[in-house]
Amino acid sequence: RAVTLFFTMDACKALGADAAWRGLPVGQGGAKDGGTLDDRYEAQGVATFEVLLAACVEMGATFMICEMGLRARGLDAMPLRDDVPVQPGGLVTFLNDASKDGAIIFI
């Protein structure tokens, strides 16, 4: 089944070459940022963000990064990861590409 992961606003940092996502604040788990929470998960034997991202790449997921989100957050010049095939787009592109009988999950 085809899957597209759509990254917008600060989530765009997850696809940046410099792992800036690790510094993003989190609202759960008692951690101050994404990196601290991810490290805690790793110590508990839970798959890390990098492991899950690599699994999505291996399974052929599409990664779409929101052009408006990049501009709105001043990230349009941010170098992107070279281990993830990222395609630019927007919400309209994402919705247009969505299957009529598929599902959209927002987390």
Functional labels for PLM-detected ranges:
Residues 1-3, 58-61, 99-102:
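Short coil/turn connectors at secondary-structure junctions
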Residues 3-9, 64-67:
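Short internal beta-strands
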Residues 12-15, 71-73:
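Short, active-site-adjacent cap segments at secondary-structure transitions
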Residues 14-25:
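Glycine-rich loop at the start of a catalytic domain that most often binds anionic cofactors/ligands
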Residues 23-58:
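A glycine-rich helix N-cap at a beta->alpha junction
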Residues 23-26, 82-86, 105-106:
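Short, low-complexity, polar/charged sequence segments that are solvent-exposed and flexible
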Residues 40, 47, 93-107:
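Flexible, low-complexity linker and terminal segments
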Residues 45, 49-96:
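A charged, amphipathic interaction segment
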